Regions:
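The feature captures the catalytic groove of carbohydrate-active enzymes
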Residues: 75-96, 102-119, 126-177
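Substrate-binding groove/exosite segments of carbohydrate-active enzymes
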Residues: 2-102, 171-173
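Beta-strand segments within the central parallel beta-sheet cores of soluble alpha/beta enzyme folds
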Residues: 62-66, 115-122
């Protein structure tokens, strides 16, 4: 049933729900925007807590995460991008995924989140510690380093002729904050 638009909160709830996307019954995603964007990994994880947990829909959060985790695992194992979740190969996607799981923990409690996501977070950490990501490296000083001179790897991903408008390389502050 549609949420009645009788309050500001209900209007926000309605707006959030308009981005839910289920191409198959067993899948759950968030669209990055209408009509031009599809499902983009960075946007998915950044917006997931606000579009689910803040409107008291933890089940939707868990369904979306249940869809996203196999896609990320597949990328970590094969290096191949997902068909539905675009830009899953971007290095900060993994960091935003962990951030989203932290928001789940804040809302639903550490024990519940630990039960659902602890092992997967460990897989991501191992992936970086073993230097498996093609575009980001964990350096000896404990910071994450990217080489983005010829490839847009951050949220500042505008390109002209396939090259970044703002090339960002090194210890990107938002990756290491």
């Amino acid at each position: 049933a549609r949420t009645p638009r009788i309050s500001f909160y209900n209007c926000l709830k309605n707006s959030a729900q308009q981005f839910y996307f289920r191409p198959k019954e067993e899948d759950a995603y968030l669209l990055a925007g209408y009509p031009w964007f599809k499902v983009r990994a960075r946007d998915l994880f950044i917006s997931m807590p606000g579009c689910t947990l803040s409107i008291e829909d933890p089940v939707r959060f868990e369904k979306i995460m249940h869809t996203a985790i196999p896609a990320i695992r597949s990328f970590m194992q094969t290096g191949k991008a997902d068909e539905e979740i675009r830009e899953i190969e971007n290095p900060d996607v993994f960091l935003w995924d962990i951030w989203a799981m932290q928001q789940h923990s804040r809302k639903m409690g550490v024990e519940k989140s630990k039960e659902l996501y602890f092992n997967f977070i460990g897989e991501i950490i191992t992936y970086f510690r073993e230097q498996k990501h093609p575009d980001m490296k964990l350096m000896e000083n404990g910071l994450l380093f990217v080489e983005g001179r010829n490839k847009a790897l951050t949220w500042m991903n505008s390109t002209v002729d396939g090259k970044p408008v703002v090339s960002r390389s090194g210890y990107i502050v938002e990756f290491n904050a």
